[in-house]
């Protein structure tokens, strides 16, 4: 009986931990769709068709997903003219117009991207990153409107247009992983990115099967993952 009580205590503790975890974004009823070897025009067409499905509430897209098993990209952030002081960031290398709204990630300072085109030179940084920038370069008037550099880009100077709430990297049911120590930096994508996020009114097994069948029928020669 003592062993059984201990096991029940552990299970209950894990359940309460899961209830208390907040990844910082709304993942309820959201499915992730990807099409191997697809181009942006194909993804635009695909997402337009998905939006017409009767059980679909909303759609978005991104090149990075903050879950285990999906692409991650890390770079270094600094300010123009200072090559010594830099810090690591996790890069969300292309989110569309609906990403923050659909996943309910608040913009707490500044605004969403105002330059919505392929040559957008704006970025959104999370609160962790904003705090690091303020602490490192002693900015007393915040980060919105400031210029930063980010490695991995040909023209690597960007202007911060907004600050978002922090999100957690890793499995939803855990406390995340070591990447949570790194700030997130968001870039804009004018066209549909690789990972298409589909929010259903109610996510059921048949909803996923219908989604898989619809997308696969559109691109029979491509590998479709839902």
Descriptions of predicted regions:
Residues 2-28:
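Alpha-helical transmembrane segments
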Residues 18-44:
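Membrane-interface junction motifs in transport/secretion proteins
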Residues 22-23, 65-69, 173:
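Surface-exposed extracellular loop regions of Gram-negative outer-membrane beta-barrel proteins
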Residues 33-38, 83-89, 112-120, 134-135, ...:
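Short, contiguous acidic/charged loop-to-helix segments that flank catalytic cores in large enzymes
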Residues 41-60, 127-131, 152-226:
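"Rare, low-scoring activations can occur
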Residues 47-112, 226:
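Short amphipathic beta-strand/extended segments in non-transmembrane regions
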Residues 72-83, 141, 173-182:
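Short, surface-exposed loop/helix-turn segments at secondary-structure junctions
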Residues 86-177:
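Hydrophobic secondary-structure segments that place a key small or acidic residue at a functional site
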């Amino acid at each position: 009986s003592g062993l059984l009580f201990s096991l029940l205590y552990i299970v209950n503790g894990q359940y309460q931990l899961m209830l208390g975890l907040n990844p910082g974004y709304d993942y309820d009823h959201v499915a992730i769709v990807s099409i191997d070897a697809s181009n942006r025009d194909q993804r635009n067409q695909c997402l337009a068709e998905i939006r017409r499905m009767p059980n679909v509430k909303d759609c978005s897209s991104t090149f990075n997903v903050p879950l285990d098993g999906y692409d991650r990209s890390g770079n270094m952030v600094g300010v123009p003219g200072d090559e010594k002081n830099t810090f690591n960031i996790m890069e969300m290398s292309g989110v569309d117009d609906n990403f923050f709204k659909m996943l309910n990630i608040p913009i707490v300072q500044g605004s969403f991207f105002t330059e919505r085109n392929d040559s957008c030179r704006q970025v959104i940084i999370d609160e962790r990153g904003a705090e690091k920038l303020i602490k490192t370069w002693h900015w007393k008037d915040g980060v919105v409107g400031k210029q930063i550099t980010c490695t991995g880009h040909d023209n690597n100077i960007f202007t911060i247009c907004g600050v978002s709430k922090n999100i957690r990297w890793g499995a939803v049911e855990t406390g995340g992983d070591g990447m949570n120590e790194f700030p997130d930096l968001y870039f804009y994508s004018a066209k549909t990115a690789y990972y298409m996020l589909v929010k259903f009114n109610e996510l059921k097994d048949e909803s996923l099967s219908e989604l898989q069948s619809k997308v696969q029928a559109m691109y029979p020669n491509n590998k479709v993952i839902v």
